[in-house]
Amino acid sequence: MTETESAILAHARRCAPAESCGFVVRTPEGERYFPCVNISAEPEDYFRMAPEDWLQAKMQGEIVALVHSHPGGLPWL
């Protein structure tokens, strides 16, 4: 498992039972996971990323993936 995958799974565990969400960002230093705040009115069923997080992730580098969890489901990376 990569460091990025480990960070994604750790974030999903911290957010449960709500959905986690974030971006995988490619920077000059390498790939990294950028966790975002789920601002959905129903975070246990849906996700909505905070616009500020989206902007900060974009400023870090190239967004190469959008990631979110399905609480109660199996991880699929």
Stretches with model-predicted labels:
Residues 1-63, 72-77:
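Conserved beta-strand-loop surface patch within small alpha/beta domains used
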Residues 69:
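Conserved residues at the C-terminal ends of beta-strands
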